[in-house]
Amino acid sequence: MQTGLPRQRAGFTLVEMLIVVAMIGILAAIALPRINLSRLRSKGAIQGLGTTMLAFQREAIGRQHNMVIMVDVPGRALRALYDSTNDVRINNNERVRIIPVGEEIVFGKPAAVPARSFGANPVNFTTTELSTGLPAMVLYRNGSAKEFGGLYLSTAKAMAGAPGHANETWAMELVRATGRAEWLRWNGTAWVRGF
């Protein structure tokens, strides 16, 4: 015969678990609308493009031929031409890679944001790829760029002037001597370097 205190069960009841799940749902319903997903998406897209530009510069040096990066504004993408003939034209035997800029990201800047020294247009390069007519950046095989220029990237909400989205505008400046793409972010009052 067993005597003593009854054994207590470890664990949670179904009712307790349902209460916890309901509380998590209520908190999520309150918090999720306040998360700025477009800011996170824009930062992710810019970091991805920054890394891609660095890789293209290294590719030009490593393969010892020009890299032509075309800016397709309507298609919201960059097109990279591995220009083995160094003629700034797509030929049959040359590889072209398309890099989308990201969800909700567009080329351009809101009218209220001041322009950088390279100009106010969404894309400010005078070189064009000869077969498509798209504005292009040319990275030479020594790592330098053909010209100084830049482009602006922004979220659709920032372009529309939505409140709370003014700091979702970015500028990329291509330095001619080094071929380095420098990134700047509009913080609402000034351009600041970095991601």
PLM region spans:
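N-terminal helix-rich module
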Residues: 2-21, 25-51, 58, 66, ...
